[in-house]
């Protein structure tokens, strides 16, 4: 399962985990990706998408019009 948000484009990034003794270890930070079913009112159908938590908040505030435009392009 790829961990990339289709709306915001968020994906993994690399960084350091730093202990109390200031030891650095390389690690990979994953985005908070959720699999969601969203009702598209314009198309009268459900779609399954992988969205980040930030994208879910954007859709709840602005509606599904942006998501519908993005999915029609694919």
Curated annotation (Swiss-Prot):
Cysteine pairings via disulfide bonds: none
Pfam families: Ribosomal_L28
BP-aspect Gene Ontology terms: translation
Keywords, alphabetical: Ribonucleoprotein, Ribosomal protein
Top-level lineage group: Bacteria
Transmembrane intervals: none
SUPFAM superfamilies on file: L28p-like (SSF143800)
Gene Ontology CC: one annotated term: ribonucleoprotein complex
Gene Ontology molecular functions: structural constituent of ribosome
InterPro entries cross-referenced by the UniProt entry: Ribosomal_bL28, Ribosomal_bL28/bL31-like_sf, Ribosomal_bL28_bact-type, Ribosomal_bL28_sf
Similarity field: Belongs to the bacterial ribosomal protein bL28 family.
Stored HAMAP family: Ribosomal_bL28 (MF_00373)
PANTHER family, sorted: 39S RIBOSOMAL PROTEIN L28, MITOCHONDRIAL, LARGE RIBOSOMAL SUBUNIT PROTEIN BL28M
Official protein name in the record: Large ribosomal subunit protein bL28
Species per Swiss-Prot/TrEMBL record: Chloroherpeton thalassium (strain ATCC 35110 / GB-78)
Lineage: Bacteria, Pseudomonadati, Chlorobiota, Chlorobiia, Chlorobiales
């Amino acid at each position: 399962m790829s961990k990339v948000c289709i709306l915001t484009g968020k994906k993994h990034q690399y960084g350091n985990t730093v202990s109390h003794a200031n030891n650095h270890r390389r690690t990979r930070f994953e985005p908070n990706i959720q699999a969601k079913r969203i009702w598209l009112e314009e198309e009268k159908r459900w779609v399954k998408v992988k969205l980040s938590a930030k994208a879910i908040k954007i859709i709840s505030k602005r509606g599904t019009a942006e998501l519908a435009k993005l999915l029609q392009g694919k």
